[in-house]
A protein has these predicted regions:
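Compositionally biased regions
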Residues: 5, 21-22, 30-31, 96, ...
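Generic structural marker for isolated residues within well-ordered, non-membrane alpha-helices
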Residues: 13, 86, 135, 200, ...
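Sec-dependent N-terminal signal peptides of Gram-positive bacterial secreted proteins and lipoproteins
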Residues: 3-25
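Solvent-exposed amphipathic alpha-helical surface segments
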Residues: 19, 96, 145, 203-207
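Catalytic-core signature of thiol
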Residues: 159-432, 437-446
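Positively charged, low-complexity intrinsically disordered regions
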Residues: 7, 37, 62, 81, ...
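A generic local structural motif
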Residues: 3-4, 69, 280-281
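Primary recognition of N-terminal secretory signal peptides and signal-anchoring hydrophobic helices
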Residues: 25-169
Length: 446
């Protein structure tokens, strides 16, 4: 009996030693330990390491932003790559990240690109209906450092290109299949609704290619205006924030003078980003990361057939430098910092232009697209981009009172404010989210 106890104790000690050694080796994600001259097979060892890492919280520190596997579905695969949802890459890496044809991932940062085909050992996989990418493989292609701290289960990723612009000097969403169909507003004052729906469609591309109803946005909103009255970007924001739309164009086609109030929104817009006036870098980053940016111009052109001294028809280039306020909305779909100033009808200090999508049909400009100089008085003054668009079943209900959204602002020169709204629940429900407008950058809330 005494020997049995000794054997049991000895076995227990060996087990502790083995577990301790296993833990140490499992945390080593860069080498394989040899055991008495024998090399352990990587196909056996790596899954054990991954299982150990996935058994605890994985932490990510990416360019001063922090994430955990408790907040995002982050995991280590059987090849010891830290895998993150592709939906994280855009904001985590401050990059453009999109899936094409459900089998190809294109990530862009600075002037660098990382292109992956869907494959188990290629750094781009599909798991439980969601796409994932390897941070280690991305870092090697995007000039970033990537290290894994085994003691804290923390991956750290930093950009080696310090001081380099996030975006390239030239970018065109048409070349990335992220521009919606060119349409014609006709004689109606609906440019604001065309710009809003086009920007929304662009934000969903290339993963989804949808066509939303301009008729519904311009007629089934809460502003009690007709299609000849015109509008502005805040009206589109209010319509979308209230989940009054969007609806499909096929269900409420344009130009027939009637709309359908019985249609439900097919998408829920959960976040919109208002970009500060003349923040050209912010506009470029928004186009790069999210898609088309709705903006405003002053235009003396009423259609593709109208002539104006501010538009060079030969080069499809526009620049207005006066005091008149905006009266027309378009969508910024790209830029060219070196676009020649000589292409415009006015004398300019320097080169550079935004590439804009219009709503005057394909006969205007270059198949509906034209250039607007950086020196234009109004371009980039009022801007909005749609940054979070979810399926229409994300929530069961919405309670709201401000159906016209942001129509003005007032304040008391204070940094903090409190607000409240009271609604009567229709049944026993759980509050999952709340929405509001923040009219200043870097606003925090709780």
């Amino acid at each position: 009996m005494k020997y049995s106890k000794r054997y049991i104790a000895f076995t227990f000690i060996l087990a502790l030693i083995f577990v301790s050694n296993f833990y140490i080796y499992a945390k080593d994600s860069s080498t394989l330990g040899a055991f008495r001259g024998a090399q352990i097979d990587n196909t056996i060892w790596s899954p054990l390491v991954a299982a150990d890492v996935n058994g605890t919280t994985i932490r990510l520190r990416i360019e001063n932003k922090e994430y955990t596997s408790e907040d995002e579905h982050v995991y280590m695969d059987e090849n010891r790559n830290i895998m993150v949802p592709v939906s994280m890459l855009r904001d985590a890496l401050n990059s453009s990240a999109h899936v094409y044809n459900k089998n190809e991932l294109l990530v862009e940062k600075h002037s660098l690109t990382a292109d992956f085909k869907l494959a188990d050992n290629n750094g781009f996989v599909q798991y439980k209906g969601q796409f994932y990418a390897s941070l280690d493989k991305l870092s090697k292609l995007l000039d970033m450092t990537c290290s894994f701290d085994t003691a804290t289960n923390t991956l750290t990723m930093t950009d080696k290109s310090e001081g380099v612009s996030t975006v390239p000097t030239k970018y065109d969403l048409r070349e990335r299949q992220r521009v919606s169909l060119i349409r014609d507003q006709g004689s109606y004052g609906t440019c604001w609704a065309f710009a809003a729906t086009s920007a929304l469609e662009s934000a969903l591309m290339p993963e989804e290619q949808l066509l939303f109803s301009v008729d519904h946005m311009s007629m089934s909103n809460s502003f009690n205006v007709n299609q000849y009255d015109g509008g502005e970007y805040t009206m589109g924001m209010a319509y979308l924030a209230a989940w009054q739309g969007p609806v499909y164009d096929a269900d409420d086609p344009y130009g027939d003078g009637v709309t359908r109030d019985d249609l439900a929104a097919v998408k829920h817009v959960q976040q919109m980003l208002i970009i500060d006036g003349k923040d050209y870098q912010g506009i470029k980053e928004a186009v790069f990361k999210y898609g088309g940016v709705q903006t405003s111009l002053y235009s003396t052109i009423a259609s593709s057939k109208t002539k104006t001294p501010y538009y060079n028809k030969q080069t499809n280039s526009y620049c207005y430098m006066g005091q008149d306020k905006p009266n027309h909305d378009v969508v910024i779909i790209g830029w060219d910092d070196n676009y020649p100033k000589e292409n415009f009808n006015v004398d300019l200090e320097g080169d550079g232009a935004f590439i804009c999508q219009n709503s005057w049909g394909s006969s205007f400009g270059d198949n509906g697209v034209f250039y607007v100089s950086y020196y234009d008085t109004n371009v980039g003054t009022h801007n909005v981009v749609y940054t979070d668009i979810e399926s229409a079943d994300n929530y069961d209900n919405i309670y709201q009172s401000d159906l016209c959204g942001w129509v003005g602002k007032m304040g008391y020169d204070k940094e903090d404010m409190y607000g409240a709204n009271i609604f009567t629940a229709q049944s026993a429900e759980s509050l999952r989210a709340s929405g509001f407008y923040a009219t200043a950058a870097d606003t925090s809330y709780k």
